[in-house]
């Protein structure tokens, strides 16, 4: 079929990727500048089919209530700085979602967020001692109210029957928990955001792959291809945001901005064990996070998770890591080699040598068969039966490799990195965890870095969207309590 070139269109804002990041930024800009035209480009035929899809992530509302990698122990002391920072960012997300419900942009809170207890689990003397220290430290902090702790086997089994039945308690176990954790369906949330965007005039072009992003004066020329017809079209945008998951790196590279020089990406695939037995699923209602093995990367932290997806309760365990050179679940086997540049190849090669813990972990994970996966599950659920669990593939995560700094030939980062040009006309988000949980916080950072000249004008409206904007809730318990009660009620999380 012959391809055709359509006439160039012009738009104020172009969002690449129909996932939670683009959807969140689009909603913010629509509220701040309702007259600005927006277009979303998505390679697939539906929104939220990659990392935002509910079975492609754990759906944890990451607020450091249970995730032990945010509270490392250093010289016998539990460090809380990361936990407080992550919690602060999630409070921003809660406020923004509540505001969007009040504004009618989002339609149904129960469709995308549900209250599920968050639990930290430790077994063996060392882990129990650590967990007790962690509880004693965090429970005193205003951002972690209502946290509880027990080492009692009976209380453990009452709260977590699946994990208690058949367990040998002689080695010692402990859990700390809070009832007010959340499970979030980021796929449903993305779809609600985009449905609201369409109502307010945003154009969404599904089945359109962005082939190139190049500067055109002070603007950006975006070349897209219809994946079904092969037709090529161009769009000129005043501002471009690349929220395309793993493909943000190659698209930023194509843009030619100097800020992306030296950056690379290391793709890691994931798998879950998903429970297929309804009777088993009914016996567990919590997100239970354990401790990563010594030397293992943060992504290896195992967890047994209640999920609420499309009104149905599910149960998963994992993640188990894998490796492919793809940057997206529906990506190409050539994604990684195509991303190599003279400015990043040394950093990417060096990471394999410098990150021996990650290399060892990936090799061990790749060698695991189903019996080995079930053995890992039985550390949490001792009586798990093989026939009750199926293996499903999760989303693709591309970890950030930062440029060479000092003596290190590049460094592997397990967080996110926002890249933008100095003019603030193009930005993209790299990396993975905590990802979707901090989307509103990350998109506010996009606004600050790319629209600095507008922030004074936008300030009052941003404060309406996020009442705590510009304030550290950790130092203002009164405001924290106010926004907590507001979000609990508006998001229908009150019991």
Where are these regions (language model features)?
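Glycine-rich FAD pyrophosphate-binding loop
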Residues: 30-54
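Short beta-strand to alpha-helix junction loop
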Residues: 81-94, 121-129, 176-196, 205-207, ...
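Helix-loop-beta segment of a Rossmann-like dinucleotide-binding subdomain
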Residues: 108-120, 158-200, 221, 357-361, ...
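C-terminal catalytic lobe of FAD-dependent flavoproteins
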Residues: 171-180, 188, 323, 327-457
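Beta1/beta-strand and adjacent pyrophosphate-binding region of the FAD-binding site
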Residues: 7-21, 39
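Helical element adjacent to the flavin cofactor pocket in flavoenzyme catalytic cores
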Residues: 173-239, 437-450
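Dinucleotide-binding Rossmann-like beta1-alpha1 core, especially the glycine-rich loop
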Residues: 59-158, 313-314, 326, 332-335
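Flavin (primarily FAD) binding-site architecture
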Residues: 242-257
